Amino acid sequence: MTKSELILRLAERNPHLYQRDVEKIVTTIFDEITDALARGDRVELRGFGAFSVKKRDARLGRNPRTGETVDVNQKFIPFFKTGKQLRERLNTD
């Protein structure tokens, strides 16, 4: 599901809301999650999961084309851990 499909689906399920308003809401939610992660905060949505940032240390890597050793700088990556309710819903028969 893409962001556009999510917006359309939410607008269909909530006919009292205009699609442009739903788009603003979804965009604001994504922006707030992104801003929190950029600050190093953890975003927990109970039952759904938690977003956090993990640090990858600098390391030596290898260019697969040339085999040359290269330095890979440290970086921060987003991480998502599913919540218990989401896992249970996905694994029901």
From Swiss-Prot:
SUPFAM superfamilies in alphabetical order: IHF-like DNA-binding proteins (SSF47729)
Keywords linked to the UniProt accession: DNA recombination, DNA-binding, Transcription, Transcription regulation, Translation regulation
Gene3D superfamilies membership: IHF-like DNA-binding proteins
Keyword Membrane appears in the UniProt entry: no
Assigned GO CC terms: chromosome; cytosol
Molecular function per GO: DNA binding; structural constituent of chromatin
Superkingdom of origin: Bacteria
A Pfam family the protein falls into: Bac_DNA_binding
Gene Ontology biological process terms, A to Z: DNA recombination; regulation of DNA-templated transcription; regulation of translation
Keyword Membrane: no
Protein family: Belongs to the bacterial histone-like protein family.
Subunit structure, interactors included: Heterodimer of an alpha and a beta chain.
Function: This protein is one of the two subunits of integration host factor, a specific DNA-binding protein that functions in genetic recombination as well as in transcriptional and translational control.
Protein name: Integration host factor subunit beta
Gene that this polypeptide is encoded by: ihfB
